[in-house]
């Protein structure tokens, strides 16, 4: 299987991909280097496909990869409590139904100007 090393050890690379995948699920658009964006695309596509399957096994597989971060927090005035949704809940309740009719190709990579300082090629990766 071909992949990019991204100048990191395997555990550092896996942690970075988990973090960036979770951030993309939460924010639906992030700015990163072009090489990282191309690697994130693979993992995000797999996570959304797991979300579309929606069974217990798919939910557990996605939970093993996606970080347990809060995606949004709302205040309910009637009960005077905060309700929050995690990245995993957003994946299964919002993103999976949105892409139910689409067979792959859930992300878009837009190249931007090089980063100031080291001229690394930058890109915006976003959900379609």
From Swiss-Prot:
GO biological process: translation
Any one of the GO CC terms: cytosolic large ribosomal subunit
InterPro entries in the cross-refs: Ribosomal_bL17, Ribosomal_bL17_CS, Ribosomal_bL17_sf
Listed GO MF terms: structural constituent of ribosome
Keyword Iron included in the entry's annotation: no
Keywords carried by this UniProt record: Ribonucleoprotein, Ribosomal protein
Subunit organization: Part of the 50S ribosomal subunit. Contacts protein L32.
Family (UniProt): Belongs to the bacterial ribosomal protein bL17 family.
Protein's name according to its UniProt entry: Large ribosomal subunit protein bL17
Provenance organism: Streptococcus gordonii (strain Challis / ATCC 35105 / BCRC 15272 / CH1 / DL1 / V288)
């Amino acid at each position: 299987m071909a992949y990019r090393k991204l100048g990191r050890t395997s555990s550092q690379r896996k942690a970075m991909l988990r973090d960036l995948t979770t951030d993309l699920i939460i924010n639906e658009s992030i700015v990163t280097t072009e090489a990282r964006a191309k690697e994130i695309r693979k993992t995000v596509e797999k996570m959304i496909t797991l979300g579309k399957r929606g069974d217990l096994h798919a939910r557990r597989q996605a939970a093993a990869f996606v970080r347990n971060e809060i995606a949004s927090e709302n205040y309910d005035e009637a009960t005077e409590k905060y309700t929050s949704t995690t990245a995993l809940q957003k994946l299964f309740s919002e993103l999976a139904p949105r892409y139910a009719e689409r067979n792959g190709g859930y992300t878009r990579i837009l190249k931007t100007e090089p980063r100031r300082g080291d001229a690394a090629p930058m890109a915006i990766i976003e959900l379609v």
